[in-house]
Amino acid sequence: MTEFDNLTWLHGKPQGSGLLKANPEDFVVVEDLGFTPDGEGEHILLRILKNGCNTRFVADALAKFLKIHAREVSFAGQKDKHAVTEQWLCARVPGKEMPDFSAFQLEGCKVLEYARHKRKLRLGALKGNAFTLVLREISDRRDVETRLQAIRDGGVPNYFGAQRFGIGGSNLQGALHWAQSNAPVRDRNKRSFWLSAARSALFNQIVHQRLKKPDFNQVVDGDALQLAGRGSWFVATSEELPELQRRVDEKELMITASLPGSGEWGTQRAALAFEQDAIAQETVLQSLLLREKVEASRRAMLLYPQQLSWNWWDDVTVELRFWLPAGSFATSVVRELINTMGDYAHIAE
């Protein structure tokens, strides 16, 4: 399995280095739910500003404040501890007066707004995230500037970031140990983290191998293609290749890569053979996903940061702004720009 730091770069390995997350204020994330609260219902949606707090810690503190079970507090996604983040949490508080959230006191955390909502906020139920990042101590401004232009046009690999695999790859190591020991894992969080890490690592490996090909973004017979911004996909046939290639070139369609698991992968013929060969040696992780009945799915191979802009504060400091769809990683954008330095460059929650 290729380590995250050695996965193929779309625009070649960066020439220079830089500092990511010199302090939490250098990594700002604002959740975009894509909808507004209903204004009624048994749930309460809260928009929370946090600095130096991980999501689970805040959710548990909120549950304690509301005197409800921790499982009654949900969120759409985990957010980095070592960052300034605005995210939505959801608490099930039926048939009660609206609590006085001004009394909710937690260091590094502030409730910005809240409203009633009819439905529980589920994991992944957000449109995307807006990022404002500051990269410092950049050693090669010209190279970074060239890469930013290239990313605006050509995107970046849609890799799962190193955070997905835990500090020092602990989640992936946990998955491997679990697969080899065949021992039951009763901790639901561990199961979720480990299975997610296993499937993400296999996806990254498939994308890594495809990007080695000079014609990586050329549609081949049996590719699974996705309408940009949509979750469903369809299979390319040889008769349609010219027209499908035109639509891929115009970014109307996206070539996808497999999130392996049980059931059909989605690709067929030449494309399926390539994906199977790309992870043929990773039998342990594939067996784990089959054993645990994790359903196979698809994910776009490339990621195009939206609303990308940048501002050089000086020759060694640049501020980046961009928006990514849910499930995509800002660190996968940054790795195409610089070789990152800093204690928190890849740290997970």
UniProtKB/Swiss-Prot annotation:
Binding of substrate, residues:
F27, N129, F329
Q: Which NCBIfam families match?
A: PRK00984.1-4, tRNA_TruD_broad
Specify one Pfam family. TruD
Active site per database record? D80
Native species? Salmonella newport (strain SL254)
One GO BP on record is:
tRNA pseudouridine synthesis
EC number(s) in its UniProt entry?
5.4.99.27
Give Gene Ontology CC terms: cytosol
The protein's matches in PROSITE patterns, at most eight in alphabetical order, are given as: TRUD, UPF0024
What InterPro entries does the annotation carry?
A: PsdUridine_synth_cat_dom_sf, PsdUridine_synth_TruD, PsdUridine_synth_TruD_CS, PsdUridine_synth_TruD_insert, TruD_catalytic, TruD_insert_sf, TruD_pseudoU_synthase
Q: Does the keyword Isomerase apply?
A: yes
GO MF terms held by the record: RNA binding; tRNA pseudouridine(13) synthase activity
| Disulfide-bond pairs as recorded | none
* UniProt family annotation: Belongs to the pseudouridine synthase TruD family.
Residues annotated as domain TRUD: 155-303
Which reaction is recorded as catalysed by this protein? Answer: uridine(13) in tRNA = pseudouridine(13) in tRNA
| Signal sequence, renumbered to the chain | none
Q: Which UniProt keywords apply?
A: Isomerase, tRNA processing
Q: What does this protein do?
A: Responsible for synthesis of pseudouridine from uracil-13 in transfer RNAs.
* UniProt protein name: tRNA pseudouridine synthase D
What is the taxonomic lineage of the source species?
Bacteria, Pseudomonadati, Pseudomonadota, Gammaproteobacteria, Enterobacterales
